[in-house]
Amino acid sequence: MSLTNEQIIEAIASKSVSEIVELITAMEEKFGVSAAAAVAAAPAAAAAEEKTEFDVVLANAGANKVAVIKAVRGATGLGLKEAKDLVESAPATLKEGISKPEAEALKKELEDAGAQVEIK
């Protein structure tokens, strides 16, 4: 006689918690698996996703604001006044949603000019 999935579910639903724990333990031993392993594997898969878009944030202009303003103008295409206002309003986001190599190149350019930069 073969039981349907629904009959199995009904039989499990009628059991007490301690009986279900015993059933799970018996199934783990019979099939050589662990119920906890499947649950633990799910968060690991989500954590494995690598970030692909980055934001470049000017944390501090540093001592050489003129060089930083020039670097910001070159990187963003802003006018002199807009770039100056952006640098003076640090911390400020310079570029959003760019690739990692582009973000790292921009960070290096701005740090060479004397700024403190973060990639988020």
Curated annotation (Swiss-Prot):
SUPFAM superfamilies: ClpS-like (SSF54736), Ribosomal protein L7/12, oligomerisation (N-terminal) domain (SSF48300). Forms part of the ribosomal stalk which helps the ribosome interact with GTP-bound translation factors. Is thus essential for accurate translation. GO terms for molecular function: mRNA binding; structural constituent of ribosome. Homodimer. Part of the ribosomal stalk of the 50S ribosomal subunit. Forms a multimeric L10(L12)X complex, where L10 forms an elongated spine to which 2 to 4 L12 dimers bind in a sequential fashion. Binds GTP-bound translation factors. This is Large ribosomal subunit protein bL12. Keywords: Ribonucleoprotein, Ribosomal protein. One of its GO terms (cellular component) is cytosolic large ribosomal subunit. GO terms for biological process: translation. Belongs to the bacterial ribosomal protein bL12 family.
